[in-house]
Structures are given as C-alpha cells and as structure tokens.
Design a protein with these regions (language model features):
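Active-site hotspot residues in diverse enzymes, especially metal/ion-binding acidic/histidine motifs
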Residues: 1-191
Length: 191
C-alpha cells in the first residue's frame, strides 16, 4: 500500500460518515452510503438467476462476491452475490464502494471456462479492502470496544460485520495496542 494511505482512508471514511450525518463512531447503513455515492446496489440473482450463482459457487467457491460496473449515462452499479452471509455481503458492498470512492479503474474482463471474471489490480484491491474496513468499523468505535475490553465477536455483533472483519480491524488498526498502553500507563501511576 502506498505510504500514508491508511491514514488517508481513515480520514476519507470519517468525511463520508459526516456527509451522511453519522457520528464518528457509527457504522453506516451500507445501502445509505451507496445511495449517497450514487451507486445502485443490485442482487446478482436478478441478473443471472440463483441457479447460475450456485453453479458458479460449486465450480469455484468464492469466485464472485461483488463487482462494480460503470454504465452508460454515468450510472454506477454494484452487483453482489446473495449466496454469501449478510455480514459478508455488507463487506463486499463496502469493498465495491471503496473502489468507487478511490476512483479505481474498472478491471479487465476475462473468460475462464465459459465464465466471465474480472482481473484484479492487487494494490487497488488492498486499498479497497482497507477503506472498506474503515467505512464499516470506524476507528472511534474500535477504540470504544478496545478500551472496554470487548472482543472481535462483540464488535462484529454491534456493527453487523463478520467476526474475521472485526478481528482484522482490531488487529491492524493499532487500537488494541493503544488501549493496552493506556491501561499500563494508568496502572503505573504515570500521567
């Protein structure tokens, strides 16, 4: 990831949260965020049918989570796989919205075994993953949970995300270390 991106992503997530009228510790309703960004969110089964999605999932598990399309007339559509759990779907949509917010280019479409797939720019995917986490789990919310000693499961339940997503944000954001240092400082009697 490019230098400074993680801090930039936190600020961008905070800015968009403010724009839609949320507190700094409030995770957004992902569809409200999509509407704010002018992105339509569509269930893939409307386009290809559930049987086709299940067939793809059986042929290559996890091959399709979500994808964003920039259509004629300036229309932007995020299509998600309804076969996934709701918490995963929320993360997938947030990931696609992150691509839009960051102005990432549409990936190249390729055919593999009769199925169309997008190739991924690894750096853009990493950035979108990080920003999606910032959108779904604001740093202020992470701090609140870390200082309270709450675990990833409690955070996931509060924010409606998966436990792996909550664990990822807690572990990579630095809030656990910050809370631990704060407790150590208070316990030692130092200011």
């Amino acid at each position: 990831m490019r230098r400074g991106f993680k801090s930039e992503a936190e600020r961008l997530a905070d800015r968009v949260r403010t724009q839609i009228g949320l507190r700094s510790d409030a995770p957004p309703d992902i569809r409200q965020l999509a509407a704010h960004l002018g992105v339509e969110v569509i269930d893939a089964q409307i386009l290809v049918g559930m049987e086709s999605l299940r067939e793809l999932e059986s042929l290559q598990p996890g091959a399709f989570s979500a994808a964003t399309f920039h259509l004629a007339g300036g229309r932007t559509v995020a299509v998600y796989n309804p076969c996934n759990e709701p918490a995963r779907t929320k993360s997938d949509i947030a990931h696609e919205l992150a691509h839009v917010m960051l102005g990432h280019e549409v990936r190249e479409l390729q055919q593999i075994g009769g199925h169309a797939f997008f190739t991924c720019n690894p750096e853009q995917e990493e950035e979108a993953n990080w920003l999606a986490g910032c959108l779904l789990l604001p740093r202020e919310l992470l701090l609140h949970h870390a200082y309270a000693g709450a675990d990833a499961q409690a955070l996931a339940a509060t924010a409606g995300v998966s436990v792996p997503m909550a664990r990822f944000r807690l572990n990579t954001s630095g809030v656990l270390l910050q809370a631990r240092r704060s407790r150590t400082t208070r316990g030692s009697g130092r200011p």
